[in-house]
From Swiss-Prot:
Function: Catalyzes the formation of 6,7-dimethyl-8-ribityllumazine by condensation of 5-amino-6-(D-ribitylamino)uracil with 3,4-dihydroxy-2-butanone 4-phosphate. This is the penultimate step in the biosynthesis of riboflavin.
Organism of this sequence: Buchnera aphidicola subsp. Schizaphis graminum (strain Sg)
Pfam hit, one: DMRL_synthase
Catalytic activity field: (2S)-2-hydroxy-3-oxobutyl phosphate + 5-amino-6-(D-ribitylamino)uracil = 6,7-dimethyl-8-(1-D-ribityl)lumazine + phosphate + 2 H2O + H(+)
Protein name: 6,7-dimethyl-8-ribityllumazine synthase
Active site, renumbered: H89
Residues annotated for (2S)-2-hydroxy-3-oxobutyl phosphate binding in this entry: S86, T87, R128
Entry EC no(s): 2.5.1.78
Length: 159
C-alpha cells in the first residue's frame, strides 16, 4: 500500500494571497495570520509571497484564475469575509466564490485554500480572525503548505 502524506515546511515555494478589501478590518487579521504562518512555520521568504488586494470576495476568483494560468505560483490563499445580511446576497456571493475557486483549483492543478469567512454576524467574524476561534487565515496557510508538498509528491510519482 502506498500512502502520500506531507508536512508543512516548504522553503522554495511561491504563494499568492488574494485578499478582499471589503470588511478589511477583519481581513487584515486573517492576512497577518496567513503571512505569519507562511514565514515562521513554512519558512517561506516574504519575497516569495505576492499579496493582491481586490474590492470584495466576489472578485477573488477572476484574479485566482489569472494567477493559476501563469503557472508561476505553487498555491493561492483566498482571504475575505462575507457576513450574512437581511437578504440572500450573502449566499450568492459565498456560493459563487467557493464554486469558482474550486473549479479553478482543479482546472489548473493548483491548491487554492480558503481563508474566506462566511458568518452570521460581525462577532463571529472577529472571533475567527484571531480571537476565540483561532485565525482562519493561518489555517488556510497551513493547508496551502501541506497541499504544496502533496502536489510535489504527486508530480514526482507521475514523472
Amino acid at each position: 500500500m502506498n500512502i502520500i502524506q506531507s508536512g508543512i515546511n516548504v522553503k522554495n515555494a511561491s504563494i499568492t494571497i488574494i485578499i478582499a478589501r471589503f470588511n478589511e478590518f477583519i481581513n487584515k487579521n486573517l492576512l497577518s495570520g496567513a503571512i505569519d504562518t507562511l514565514t515562521r512555520i513554512g519558512q517561506i521568504d516574504k519575497e516569495k509571497i505576492l499579496t493582491i488586494y481586490v474590492p470584495g470576495t466576489y472578485e477573488i476568483p477572476i484574479v485566482a484564475s489569472y494567477i493559476a494560468n501563469t503557472n508561476k505560483y505553487d498555491a493561492i490563499i483566498a482571504i475575505g469575509t462575507i457576513i450574512k445580511g437581511s437578504t440572500d446576497h450573502f449566499k450568492h456571493i459565498a456560493n459563487d466564490a467557493y464554486s469558482n475557486l474550486s473549479r479553478i483549483s482543479t482546472k489548473y492543478f493548483i491548491p487554492i485554500t480558503m481563508g474566506i469567512l462566511t458568518t452570521e454576524n460581525i462577532q463571529q467574524s472577529i472571533e475567527r480572525s484571531g480571537t476565540k476561534m483561532g485565525n482562519k487565515g493561518s489555517e488556510a496557510a497551513l493547508a496551502a503548505l501541506e497541499m504544496i508538498n502533496i502536489m510535489k509528491k504527486l508530480k514526482k510519482i507521475n514523472n
